[in-house]
Amino acid sequence: MPPYLYRLPTTSLITFSAILNDPSSSYTTILSDATASRTKLHLALKGIADNEPGASALAVLDAVQIYLPYLKGIIACLDADELLFKGEPTFQWRAPLTHFSFSSPLLPLASIHSEHLMVVLTYALALSNYAHSILASLPAFEIPAGPKAMPHMSSEDEKRTTAGLARAVDLLCQASGVAEWAAENVCLQVEPLKGVSSGRLGKGKWPAESSRETFKALSMILLADAHLTAIRKLLFPVLTYTLFAPPGPPLPPNHPSAPLQAKLYLYVHQLYSSARALLSVHHQPTSSAPSNSSRKLFRSNTDKDVIEPEAVEGEIIPELKRYLAKEAQLALALAHKWLGIDAGENGKGAKVGEALAWVKDAQGRLEDLEDSKMRAKLKGLSIGKSRERKKEERRARMGRVERELEVVKAWVKAYQKMNDTVAFQPVPPVSSLVTPSGRPIFGPKAFIPPPSKFSPSRIGHLNEEQGNDSPELGETEDTSYAGKGNYF
């Protein structure tokens, strides 16, 4: 059930005073505070990785909110040559979206911009995981498949569910905006480094997280998850009707528009499909991969304790591939279901054959998802995941598919009977029908990064001399900005 639950990055400890030279001794206290804020982020991520009590995505978001302004200040001072690296810098991170044959190693990433990229990635993934935790804490409100107990909700549960769904949509839109911003800003600063490091260190590939395509795809995935959550919220008011009425025609008077739902699902399918295409753009085929001796990611004599992978192919983890394949197929099936319902309910009896074509196609696609061959194919992409987690995800997936398949079968039966007894219309092939374009109901929430905690002193002095009170220069700690306080 969307949103996807991501594994968050982890990192090693860093002491900024040990890797940075402060010629003017003006930043001693600030570097100490920056080290403390990064340590807080390290501990929050480690707590989640180790399943420690009290660890949560919310704690990670809080740590990123504190650390990011310090990191921006350090980058500004490095650009102004007020801080200098004592040697070649490496920032050790585990890449959560890159597939490795064995356990994910700590990768020594070069440049402060790589650190910035991984922190922003952590922020986007933590926002999505926080939305996931909110939805997981809500009372069950969808109708289960089969003869099971129906969910019972009090008025307080209904209010809590409505608020939780709305909050999750907002968080996912924020996460989509963060990923989109990173693709257009931070990734552009990392791109030049990849060529330099590749030539010096043996043409090793960078992890998938360093690619603009990955961040653009991630933004699409998060936006698609937000739309699916919004659809759940859209259907929530008709829950009472669907609990007691059998599936099939007619729709209740207050039911959301069938063509609207069809276009929403078509847009979701478009997002997932585009994300899958983007994630495969920068992958090279195995036959063209460099030899093992030349596929080291980053070698550094000063990082002997860092486990360096023999090969980093830049391929996305199989779990995410599996998720995209399943959700794209399911979204298209549901889009066709609602196109059929629109034709049957709003066609005034003139489009029964068309309606039957759409809902039969939806039934076929859902049966493909339920089919053992499709399940085996999807399961084969999940190697390396814990057995219990695979079972849990399979149960959740089959519950959704079975529930939708029961509903679609009811519509097929109703339209088939109508066509056999009243309409007598030919059933056209789906390929001959016109599929409308998808429709979004919102876009990514624009991300405006928080202001730097500090700025280069010479810029601050210049700002004072010119009488410029721009928040971009000098101290910006108390500056107000769009989205302030709305990180989680």
Curated annotation (Swiss-Prot):
Entry's Gene Ontology cellular component terms: plasma membrane
PROSITE patterns named in the record: BRO1
Listed transmembrane segments: none
Region (Disordered): 449-488
Disulfide feature: none
GO BP term (any one): cellular response to pH
Pfam families in the record: BRO1 (PF03097)
Protein role: Required for the proteolytic cleavage of the transcription factor RIM101 in response to alkaline ambient pH.
Record-linked PANTHER family: PH-RESPONSE REGULATOR PROTEIN PALC (PTHR40463:SF1)
Name of the protein: pH-response regulator protein palC
Organism ancestry: Eukaryota, Fungi, Dikarya, Basidiomycota, Agaricomycotina
